[in-house]
């Protein structure tokens, strides 16, 4: 034996490597794992044998850090928590968990416990460089090691801690919103249902160490089970997340014309659709769907038929349609070329995009947007977060339009904004009125520069839509009207007129000839439109209600109103608003009277054979069963008698107010001079 040991020390005899290989195979995971560290949590909460109390509180907060590569527990966190809602533990809870009342009394509240747990996590992040998968993007580098939380079921983080924080209005750490359910993973991997944590360990030949239902011991045994499953080839993945799923957001940008670099060429940019993925789960294929700009050079002397995009010829109409943002969707490369700057979108270097409007692009008659890319470090933005411009191809100022004085544009003016008018008697614009006024507009056309037109005719120095300062005829908060006679440097490019809209004309409210002669006087410096094409009254599209007016009372509209002769009111008005009591009496449906005992009488019908069969009567609703029952009364009345009484009462009320009824459902006001009725306002309502 001494010789053999000496030979081993001198290295003459090699040791057998079978044992070392077997032990290394057991400790090393077979499959490549995404998470290098796992934090196993197993809470213990208050409980009762009868189950009457449904709100459970955490009384033990354990957590252990497991190294996936070697299966060792490198750090532990453990504390007892004071219950606030039910501070006294039940005997069943003490017997089950082994936690006594003194331990929870010496513990800390849950809010302080979460703060201590957060400090422990931050310490691990600094020492071991771990990182968690959260919805909030973090600047993770290659040195960071991914970590996830593991529980035996969803109860710990999905029920117990979640609802307790909601009840107590406490902020839960965001890193606890996602975890791995080891019980569900065990069931899927081994294809069998485990019988508790102890049963799952026994199935794999692992002995449970410690005390069951002890939070720290359960966490350690769960870590053993997770390490064994990883060695068997199970890949740990997130099974539950409380974070809201951020769906893909598609941003569609219209085709835009970028400012021309010289007078012989113009760059036409086509911004495509990009999909912004959720930053919680970054996709490696994000660069495939990034936004891009395809830059083309259109020569000066080319014909419209020779225009090409990506090597494909296009026509004049298609080129104009692409400029308007309706066509031209092409492929989506992974880079963007904007104003000569190559910018990588997605997971590349961060660029800060700002939106601006180029004045040189006003030659096209539309508002165009351009990007300016400047490198900027944005710590609040994660990987794949890109700020996109939201400039829409639209006309934002009425100064860039010419609106004609024909009747086709009247309906368009009503849809744009409130019509602005200028009085003829004034030399300068003032407050607009609706009478003796005229509206100064130019022709409704939008000048759009074609890519194939001669760009030399459209000088860059001539900005379309720029007017002389003295050319403003009227200006308000929402409207600016220019004098077209003073307008200078009008572009000679091709124009596209807006399709005309036929306005609905009204002939019943046309002004008289005297009013037309009076309004024919025009301002000396501003052109006027023809009054024959103007409709001063636009009837509503739909009548909201019908007004019934008495012809004989239309002449007298002053207060007080004196009724000198009877007025006949239509039956519709009478039936709708006047004398509901009389109407109910005529139809036979009246309100049941009150009986002697203060209750509402009940309407019954005679069913026995005889002369009164079928007649209705009212009696007390409480039936008198015997002589001892004294709750009811002996009230009885025929319905005809009740109707007559109701009619007599309504007649007395109307006679006191000076109105009498006749058989033809018309009422008459008393014409006595001493009983005139005046309609006037109360002193508090007078102005």
Curated annotation (Swiss-Prot):
Residues reported in the UniProt entry to bind Mg(2+) 2: 42, 156
Binding site for AMP: 44, 213
Enzyme Commission number(s) of this protein: 3.1.-.-
ZnF segments: GRF-type: 595-642
Domain Exonuclease: residue ranges: 38-226
One Pfam short name: RNase_T
Top-rank taxon: Eukaryota
Cofactor: record remark: Binds 2 magnesium ions per subunit.
Binding site for Zn(2+): 595, 597, 620, 633
Binding site for Mg(2+) 1: 42, 44, 218
Annotated active site: 44, 213
InterPro entries given in the database record: 3-5_Exoribonuclease, ERI-1_3'hExo-like, Exonuclease_RNaseT/DNA_pol3, RNaseH-like_sf, RNaseH_sf, Znf_GRF
Keywords: Exonuclease, Hydrolase, Magnesium, Metal-binding, Nuclease, Zinc, Zinc-finger
Name recorded for this polypeptide: ERI1 exoribonuclease 2
Gene: eri2
């Amino acid at each position: 034996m001494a010789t053999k040991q000496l030979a081993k020390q001198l290295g003459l005899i090699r040791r057998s490597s079978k044992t070392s290989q077997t032990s290394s195979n057991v400790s090393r995971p077979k499959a490549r794992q995404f998470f290098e560290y796992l934090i196993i949590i197993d809470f213990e909460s208050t409980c009762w044998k009868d189950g009457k109390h449904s709100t459970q509180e955490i009384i033990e907060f354990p957590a252990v850090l497991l190294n996936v590569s070697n299966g060792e527990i490198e750090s532990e966190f453990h504390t007892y928590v004071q219950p606030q809602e039910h501070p006294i533990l039940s005997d069943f809870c003490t017997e089950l968990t082994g936690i006594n009342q003194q331990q929870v009394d010496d513990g800390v509240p849950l809010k302080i416990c979460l703060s201590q747990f957060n400090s422990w996590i931050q310490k691990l992040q600094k020492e071991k460089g771990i990182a968690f998968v959260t919805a909030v993007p973090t600047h993770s580098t290659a040195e960071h090691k991914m970590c996830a939380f593991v529980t035996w079921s969803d109860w710990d983080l999905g029920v117990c801690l979640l609802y307790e924080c909601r009840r107590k209005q406490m902020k839960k750490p965001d890193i606890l919103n996602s975890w791995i359910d080891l019980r569900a993973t065990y069931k899927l991997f081994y294809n069998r249902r485990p019988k508790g944590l102890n049963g799952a360990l026994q199935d794999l030949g692992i002995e449970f160490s410690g005390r069951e239902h002890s939070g720290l011991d359960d966490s350690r045994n769960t870590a053993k089970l997770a390490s064994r499953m990883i060695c068997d080839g199970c890949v740990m993945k997130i099974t539950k997340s409380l974070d809201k799923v951020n769906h893909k957001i598609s941003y569609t940008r219209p085709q835009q014309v970028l400012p021309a670099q010289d007078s012989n060429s113009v760059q036409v940019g086509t911004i495509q659709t990009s999909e912004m993925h959720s930053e919680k789960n970054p996709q490696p294929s994000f660069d495939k769907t990034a936004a891009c700009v395809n830059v083309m050079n259109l020569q000066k002397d080319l014909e419209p038929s020779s225009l090409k995009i990506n090597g494909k010829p296009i026509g004049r109409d298609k080129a104009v349609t692409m400029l308007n943002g309706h066509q031209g969707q092409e492929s989506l490369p992974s880079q963007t070329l904007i104003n000569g700057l190559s910018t990588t979108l997605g997971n590349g270097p961060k660029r800060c995009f700002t939106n601006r409007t180029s004045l040189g692009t006003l030659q096209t008659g539309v508002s165009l947007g351009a990007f300016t890319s400047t490198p900027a470090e944005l710590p609040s933005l994660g990987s794949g977060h890109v700020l996109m411009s939201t400039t829409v191809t639209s006309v934002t100022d009425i100064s860039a339009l010419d609106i004609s004085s024909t009747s086709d544009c009247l309906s368009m003016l009503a849809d744009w904004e409130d019509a602005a008018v200028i009085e003829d008697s004034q030399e300068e614009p003032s407050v607009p009125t609706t009478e003796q006024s005229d509206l100064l507009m130019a022709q409704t056309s939008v000048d759009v520069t074609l890519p194939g037109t001669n760009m030399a005719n459209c000088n860059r120095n001539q900005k379309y839509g720029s007017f002389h300062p003295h050319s403003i005829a009227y200006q308000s908060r929402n409207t600016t009207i220019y004098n077209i006679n003073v307008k200078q440097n009008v572009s000679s490019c091709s124009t596209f007129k807006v399709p005309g809209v036929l306005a609905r004309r009204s002939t019943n409210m046309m002004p008289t000839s005297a009013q037309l002669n009076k309004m024919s006087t025009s301002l000396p410096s501003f052109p006027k439109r023809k009054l024959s094409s103007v409709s001063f009254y636009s009837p509503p599209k739909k009548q909201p209600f019908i007004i019934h007016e008495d012809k004989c009372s239309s002449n007298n509209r002053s207060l007080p109103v004196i009724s000198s002769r009877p007025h006949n009111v239509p039956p519709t008005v009478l039936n709708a608003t006047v004398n509901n009591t009389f109407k109910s009496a005529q139809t036979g449906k009246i309100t049941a009277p009150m009986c002697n005992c203060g209750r509402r009488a009940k309407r019954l019908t005679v069913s026995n054979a005889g002369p009164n069969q079928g007649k209705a009567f009212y009696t007390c609703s409480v039936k008198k069963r015997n002589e001892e029952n004294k709750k009811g009364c002996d009230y009885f009345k025929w319905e005809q008698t009740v109707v007559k009484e109701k009619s007599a009462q309504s007649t007395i009320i109307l006679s006191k107010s000076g109105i009498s009824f006749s058989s033809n459902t018309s009422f008459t006001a008393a014409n006595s001079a001493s009983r005139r009725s005046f309609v006037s306002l109360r002193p508090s309502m007078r102005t």
